[in-house]
């Protein structure tokens, strides 16, 4: 049984919600400043409320610190360092300045305890699907560009996602910024030869600092063959094939029977869809994502590799560069939230999302069967092991009629894209 304490009640309540569902742990208390919210949280989760670690009589194995760090004018990183020096494993909620990160990792290594950064967005199913699909396409196509819309409050998770997508955020070259008295400011950077355009909502409502968001984030990665988009942290993830006009003198009249492969594709594919209500995202999705970070701290915590630490430090440094380019957020007042019921909107037909979610599972099974059938057919006609063939040699070996050669080329491309064969 691991004893865990949570620091902070604002975002800490999501940690408490995650912890209450986990096995093999005991929540020994909530440590906070003693606000009305803190007392209410402690009562709701039926745990003690402390204002100092010295008040805690039980052993503490792990501390979840959900308090603003120095980057946001808080004491979260200092609290984490104090706990690490006491030999307590620590999970510190993002964002964290790279200098504070370096100090925490160094103390953790000296004390032989675990230190990690909490970042629930990386654990969300839609984000995981997006990252995996970017890697799939990147095996055969080069990233041409990345476009990002975001609220600066979640800029750290966005940078972390880009770090997973690109594997490195160096070298970071600032191409230019457009800032002014407008809600969204833009910044363009280049990482290697990949341009990334950020459009950031960089305002803070002085009466509602945490709640004034026009959006969280949206990320689009462009390739020669299309664009992959994560529309929201909770989905959907959509692939839009690139528009490419056929090289024909007569286009509409000949597409019915002589369309190129790209013209036979849908104009969009839903790769992940989850039409959950917002309350279920807060109630279930976020706590489940946080639990995955906590498990790394609780279940056999191992010392992170130097390569992993360097990547986290580099991501944090890239975050600092992004925010430096955008500048300080503009303080605004008088803004308000207005709920607009979605049923008032014009909905002319069943959405593509609804149709696709019903068919997606069956399509995946069917596609897999087709791939295996193609592969089996090739194996039946080619007996030699570890021997390379050109596509023309394969076609000749199979004995395909000329009219069906384009289909076999398509087969070979699909099999290669899905790692059944390799170039």
Predicted feature descriptions by range:
Residues 1-45:
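N-terminal Rossmann-like dinucleotide-binding module
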Residues 42, 62-67, 283-340:
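C-terminal helix-rich "cap/oligomerization" subdomain common to oxidoreductases
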Residues 97-163:
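A contiguous active-site-proximal alpha/beta segment in oxidoreductase catalytic domains
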Residues 143-236, 245-246:
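Rossmann-like dinucleotide-binding domain that binds NAD(P)(H)
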Residues 338-423:
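N-terminal accessory segments
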